[in-house]
Amino acid sequence: MSGHSKWATTKHKKAVVDARRGKLFAKLVKTVEVAAKTGGGDPAGNPTLADAIAKAKSQSVPNDNIERAIKRGSGELAGGVSYESVTYEAYGPNGVAVLVECLTDNRNRAASDVRVAITRNGGTPADPGSVSYLFNRKGVVLIDKTPTLTEDDILLAVLDAGAEEVNDVGEAFEVVSEATDLHAVRVAAAEADLTVASADISWLPSVSVPLDAEPARKVLKLVEALEDLDDVQNVWFNADISDDVMELVSS
């Protein structure tokens, strides 16, 4: 007898989801704290902080947590930590390029944890610059679809704010801009009564590697292992995984 009741399985799954949610909250709060430390605690004069707060709120991070992070970052509250931003590069299975963005208070720990996760999951650490040239740093705003909303409507609303292109990505429209124009594009979209689902600085691949189910499974396992690390904020990779392949991998 396995001793694994349906309730035990459900409870385990809930524990995993709760743990991941807790990690996500911690990462978002860390971003808010760093933004406040870098540019001050007033979101009106600190676009990076305004975007970090908006993202945290979109993921239901409690307001108290956000406020405390702002106060720690701006020095109003004791207990602030000095975080360092560092990016690691790697090749994953099938030569997929991987960028790992970290915010850490211990660079040696972050480097060690990232290296272990990469090598244990079929990847190879790469020298600085050997992978990043395959990506462009951009601002990406996702806008919820409505029955009547078109790409032209969105472009008209956000073009003057610095939008470069609008793409239909299935359940949303994606607005791409220079990273420095992200906040202006998000504000322009909101002022045009468009529903902003997210606004992030992203590393978009200039070249993609199409993957079948088995290599896709391996790459996603690597990405999941990296995202599970406390110091890791974002993982970017240039695998092109179609909806059909993703369905196979998820089943």
Swiss-Prot record:
Keywords: Cytoplasm, DNA-binding, Transcription, Transcription regulation
UniProt entry tagged with the keyword Transcription regulation: yes
Gene Ontology CC terms, in alphabetical order: cytosol
GO biological process: regulation of DNA-templated transcription
Presence of the UniProt keyword DNA-binding in the record: yes
GO terms for MF: DNA binding
Subcellular localization: Cytoplasm
InterPro entries, sorted: Integrase-like_N, TACO1_YebC-like_2nd/3rd_dom, TACO1_YebC_N, Transcrip_reg_TACO1-like, Transcrip_reg_TACO1-like_dom3, YebC-like
Family of this protein: Belongs to the TACO1 family.
Record-linked PANTHER family: TRANSCRIPTIONAL REGULATORY PROTEIN YEBC-RELATED (PTHR12532:SF6), TRANSLATIONAL ACTIVATOR OF CYTOCHROME C OXIDASE 1 (PTHR12532)
Name the record gives this protein: Probable transcriptional regulatory protein Franean1_5147
